């Protein structure tokens, strides 16, 4: 069989383009320009109002309410700039052996701002890109509101706080492990930001939980626009308390609804199994709240049709449906019309009623005269009632007159607060992933395309995914690097339907086709805020029939039905836009950002009063003493059991940045002096700490080794450590790694502390952790020139340092989740121009199927390779490679291409 010919037609790949702007903020590379903001952040005060009544009372609340909520507005730094379309176009170009010209243009306009304005932070507007931010949501939301001017700009907040108040709390510790067991010690979180949240939030159980949640609701409220909504997803353990808390924050008058929805699987309980979770819905200003009703399909056998118990046969006979007919309407004769009876009278509140009033008059049906009962009146005028009678919409029921409402008058029914259709299989990538349909409905009810959506609890990025699908802008926040690693991969590889834009030539044409009306003559601009071209459903109402000018006496039934159809109202189905199946859409440009250095609130002086009152953190001295004791016992381990740095002596050191000093013996009996620096208890080790500790060690008493211990290291940590090494080793005569790791003048060892240390001695005993201090590996990369002057990068694994010999050895690529290349690194920001996912999953499977006619298997396989596709020598002379492991740890390496 001859091979199938490839189509020459290129499938358009699109993204949603937002005309909105965002304020320019610093990148990690340009952080030195905002040192003042980092060192002395402005403190924002959120006033307390203890006079609110009724309100919850919990342990420590009086002390919390005695002071305003104080939160520092710290800078947020851009770590990566990602344009998924550029990655896909690169794959397509590789398959066709074309030059990926589109990629350069896509990144060229990422900022839309000149350099001198780029470093004048917070003063200029640049192109919108969606945002994924690592850090404490309280700090991030405060910074967004106060430093970046987003106060009153967010249309919807979706918050999914932890459900319970127990130890396990279902934190996912790796991108590879989703079978997390609640209250199981080995599944405890392995990330300092989340440990901080665990200790602060759960130390006093529900008391701390409520303090934690109230602060974040207060800051979220400040971000909401007056028409905005806040949704909180919660389980049955705390729904009653959280509703009271939201009454206190938003005001009881701002309560909209409590939505109950079915979970995919029931939660085991001692008595009844729990199959339902809840969504609490509050508006910022209930009188101005944006609301777009959603509808579900009505059917006699299914939902929405239960009240339709009568049938009108083609011969005009009307009767009640039999049980068999209700179960299967297909057995009815063709032309039968199912209906229900409705009221044709209304209350006359504040208006004249009874005999003599405008709506009190006799109506004759089938020779019998009827009057409205009691103080009620007819729902329409005499002419209107005559129209209803001519249309066969009035029927006598004893002494009452009723309105005939056909099943097909409105083939849908409005969504209420009981969502029993949300259970079902989902492709989970995160242990506590929120049901996509739940977020989708919340978003569609309260936002329009182009509106801004915020999720302070990112998880696997479901809110961002849904917002992207429906053309909303999004910001998502999480303390978990694992969560953001999963979310980033999910969004980079996502494929979405291409919906017709109302403000586009194709959209105008589609709308004319659907409505049967001539398209208006106007210039389109592709503005997403004008929405999509939506499906509509006819809605025949009593009012539309009563006021129909075309219904006349003597008309046939078909003529009357046509007149009713012409003047029927329509309802917009906001969840059913028309789709162009010939095009595909991918995620638009977004940035990965973090507080610096992945900052969390740590000291009592810096933490909000609520968290201080809920749980007093142990002193820094106590933490350092515990680390010293464990360092003495455990030493520093690499991935090989026998290779451990054992301290002969280790004691406190009275330095500014150095905490301990001691000695160890290398193989061969050579004694060496070592200095130890301990990173923050609840944060990430950044380049500033490494630099200052190294300077102090060099100026000191001749240390042979510096060990920097931290729970997490930012991506630039290795680059900083390498500045204190010997002369850079050349990978070739043309390529020099900036700061290629050398253990010369002052070897710096980055040791990742087991996060169980942050949980305290009690948990440490419970988990039985063995390797408490592990050497932080550096990726083993090979950059080489290939034919046509192009360059490739190969990742061989992670370099492991043997503390007993001082030698470096490479391990496999198994621990690497993904790696990115900026093939033209300018030193100002990291653009993800190449992306490779070496984990077990294949995230691009859906896009692969959509583009199977254009891109062959070999080109797609490049996305999962440990060797990059060839690329041109960079204009700027540098490339940067970022490697991310399954725990979300990142390392960045920069190469000078000479």
Over which residues does each language-model region extend?
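S-adenosyl-L-methionine-dependent nucleic acid methyltransferase catalytic domains
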Residues: 1-317, 365, 390-393, 397-898
């Amino acid at each position: 069989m001859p091979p199938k010919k490839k189509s020459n037609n290129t499938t358009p790949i699109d993204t949603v383009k937002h005309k909105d702007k965002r304020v320019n903020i610093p990148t990690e590379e340009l952080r030195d320009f905002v040192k003042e903001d980092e060192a002395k952040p402005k403190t924002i005060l959120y006033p307390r109002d203890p006079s609110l009544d009724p309100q919850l009372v919990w342990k420590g609340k009086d002390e919390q309410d005695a002071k305003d909520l104080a939160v520092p507005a710290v800078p947020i730094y851009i770590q990566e700039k990602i344009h998924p379309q550029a990655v896909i176009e690169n794959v397509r170009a590789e398959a066709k052996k074309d030059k990926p010209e589109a990629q350069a243009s896509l990144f060229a306009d990422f900022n839309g701002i000149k350099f001198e304005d780029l470093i004048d932070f917070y003063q200029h507007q640049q192109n919108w890109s969606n945002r994924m931010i690592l850090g404490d949501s309280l700090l991030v939301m405060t910074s967004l509101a106060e430093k970046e001017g987003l106060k009153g700009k967010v249309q919807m907040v979706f918050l999914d706080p932890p459900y319970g108040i127990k130890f396990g709390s279902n934190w996912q510790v790796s991108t590879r492990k989703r079978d997390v067991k609640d209250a199981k010690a080995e599944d405890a979180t392995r990330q300092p930001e989340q440990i901080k949240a665990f200790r602060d939030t759960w130390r006093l159980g529900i008391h701390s939980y409520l303090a934690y949640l109230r602060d974040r609701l207060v800051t979220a409220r400040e971000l909401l626009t007056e028409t905005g909504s806040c949704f909180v997803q919660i389980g049955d353990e705390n729904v009653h308390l959280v509703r009271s808390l939201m009454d206190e924050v938003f005001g009881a008058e701002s309560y909209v609804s409590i939505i109950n929805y079915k979970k995919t699987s029931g939660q085991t309980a001692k008595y009844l199994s729990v199959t339902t979770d809840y969504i609490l819905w509050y508006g910022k200003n209930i009188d101005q709240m944006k609301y777009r009703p959603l509808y579900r399909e009505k059917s006699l056998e299914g939902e929405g049709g239960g009240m339709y118990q009568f049938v009108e046969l083609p011969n005009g006979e009307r009767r009640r449906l039999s049980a068999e007919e209700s179960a299967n309407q297909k057995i009815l004769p063709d032309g039968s019309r199912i209906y229900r009876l409705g009221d044709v009278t209304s209350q006359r509140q504040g208006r004249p009623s009874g005999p003599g009033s405008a709506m009190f008059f006799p109506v004759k049906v089938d020779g019998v005269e009827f009057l409205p009962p009691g103080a009620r009146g007819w729902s329409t005028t005499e002419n209107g009632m005559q129209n209803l009678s001519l249309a066969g919409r009035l029927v006598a029921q004893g002494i009452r007159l009723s309105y005939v409402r056909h099943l097909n008058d409105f083939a849908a029914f409005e969504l209420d607060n009981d969502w029993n259709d949300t259970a079902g299989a989902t492709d989970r990538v995160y242990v506590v992933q929120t049901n996509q349909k739940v977020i989708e409905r919340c978003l569609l009810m309260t936002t329009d395309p182009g509106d801004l959506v915020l999720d302070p609890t990112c998880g696997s990025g479901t809110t961002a995914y849904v917002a992207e699908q429906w053309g909303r802008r999004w910001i998502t926040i999480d303390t978990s690097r694992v969560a953001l690693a999963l979310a980033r991969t999910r969004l980079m590889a996502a494929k979405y339907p291409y919906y017709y834009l109302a403000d586009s030539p194709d959209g105008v044409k589609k709308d004319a086709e659907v409505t049967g009306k001539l398209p208006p003559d106007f210039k389109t601009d592709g503005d997403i805020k004008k929405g999509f071209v939506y499906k509509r459903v006819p809605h025949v109402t009593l009012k539309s029939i009563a006021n129909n000018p075309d219904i006349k006496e003597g008309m046939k039934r078909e003529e009357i039905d046509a007149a009713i159809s012409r003047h029927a109202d329509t309802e917009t189905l906001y969840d059913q836009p028309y789709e162009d199946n010939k095009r595909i859409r991918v995620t638009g440009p977004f940035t990965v950002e973090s507080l610096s250095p992945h900052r969390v609130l740590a000291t009592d002086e810096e933490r909000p009063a609520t968290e201080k009152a809920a749980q007093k953190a142990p002193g820094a001295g106590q933490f350092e003493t515990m680390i010293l004791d464990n360092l003495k016992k455990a030493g520093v381990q690499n991935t090989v059991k026998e290779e451990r740095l054992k301290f002969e002596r280790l004691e406190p050191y009275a330095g500014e940045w150095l905490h301990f000093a001691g000695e160890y013996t290398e193989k061969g009996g050579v004694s060496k002096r070592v200095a130890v620096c301990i990173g923050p208890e609840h944060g990430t080790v950044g380049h500033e700490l490494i630099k200052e500790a190294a300077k102090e060690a060099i100026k000191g008493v001749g240390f042979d080794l510096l060990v920097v211990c931290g729970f997490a290291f930012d991506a630039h940590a290795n680059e900083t450590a390498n500045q204190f090494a010997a002369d850079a080793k050349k990978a070739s005569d043309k390529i020099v790694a900036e700061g290629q790791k050398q253990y010369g003048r002052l070897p710096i060892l980055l040791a990742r502390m087991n996060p169980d240390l942050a949980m305290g001695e009690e948990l440490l005993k419970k988990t039985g952790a063995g390797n408490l201090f592990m050497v932080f590996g550096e990726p083993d990369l090979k950059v080489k020139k290939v034919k046509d002057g192009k360059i490739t990068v190969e990742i061989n694994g992670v370099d492991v340092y043997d503390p007993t010999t001082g030698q470096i050895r490479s391990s496999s690529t198994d621990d690497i989740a993904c790696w990115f290349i900026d093939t033209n690194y300018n030193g100002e920001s990291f653009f993800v121009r190449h992306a490779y996912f070496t984990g077990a999953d294949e995230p691009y499977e859906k896009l692969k199927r959509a583009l199977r006619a254009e891109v062959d298997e070999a080109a797609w396989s490049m996305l999962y390779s440990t060797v990059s596709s060839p690329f041109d020598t960079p204009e700027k002379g540098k490339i940067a490679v970022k490697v991310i492991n399954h725990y979300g740890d990142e390392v960045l390496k920069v190469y000078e291409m000479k």
